[in-house]
């Protein structure tokens, strides 16, 4: 399979914007449905941010804040950054990587694109 960043045929600004939105929604909801290529690219970004959040220094918090969108989590209207550092990262304290799981789905009916569900383990 080709490099996922080459498949989109879009510029860097568009790709980064889509990844920021998808990562923020994944952390807010726990699972999302997207295309397989986006899910594979999303996994890279999500796992790096969770690894940074496991060591809650000010520098790591600023790195994560610069990437995530200001999305609210429904539970108590917490910000997704606070949710990442207070809830998600401590639950993976003893886990060294492999924080996400990808399930393949049937192809989308309109354009036959391979679909997938990505979720936090």
UniProtKB/Swiss-Prot annotation:
<dbReference type="GO" id="GO:0006412">
    <property type="term" value="P:translation"/>
</dbReference>
<dbReference type="InterPro" id="IPR036373">
    <property type="entry name" value="Ribosomal_bL17_sf"/>
</dbReference>
<keyword id="KW-0687">Ribonucleoprotein</keyword>
<dbReference type="GO" id="GO:0003735">
    <property type="term" value="F:structural constituent of ribosome"/>
</dbReference>
<comment type="similarity">
    <text>Belongs to the bacterial ribosomal protein bL17 family.</text>
</comment>
<dbReference type="Pfam" id="PF01196">
    <property type="entry name" value="Ribosomal_L17"/>
</dbReference>
<dbReference type="InterPro" id="IPR047859">
    <property type="entry name" value="Ribosomal_bL17_CS"/>
</dbReference>
<comment type="subunit">
    <text>Part of the 50S ribosomal subunit. Contacts protein L32.</text>
</comment>
<dbReference type="GO" id="GO:0022625">
    <property type="term" value="C:cytosolic large ribosomal subunit"/>
</dbReference>
<dbReference type="InterPro" id="IPR000456">
    <property type="entry name" value="Ribosomal_bL17"/>
</dbReference>
<protein>
    <recommendedName>
        <fullName>Large ribosomal subunit protein bL17</fullName>
    </recommendedName>
</protein>
<keyword id="KW-0689">Ribosomal protein</keyword>
């Amino acid at each position: 399979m080709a490099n996922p960043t080459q498949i989109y045929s879009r510029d860097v600004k568009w790709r980064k914007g889509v990844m920021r939105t998808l990562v923020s929604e994944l952390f807010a909801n726990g699972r999302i449905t997207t295309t397989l290529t986006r899910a594979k690219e999303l996994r890279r970004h999500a796992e790096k941010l969770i690894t940074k959040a496991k060591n809650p220094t000010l520098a790591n918090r600023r790195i994560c804040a610069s990437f995530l969108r200001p999305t609210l989590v429904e539970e108590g209207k917490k910000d997704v950054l606070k949710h990442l550092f207070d809830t998600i990262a401590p639950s993976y304290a003893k886990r060294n990587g492999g924080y996400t799981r990808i399930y393949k789905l049937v192809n989308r009916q309109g354009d036959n694109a391979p679909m997938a569900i990505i979720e936090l383990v």
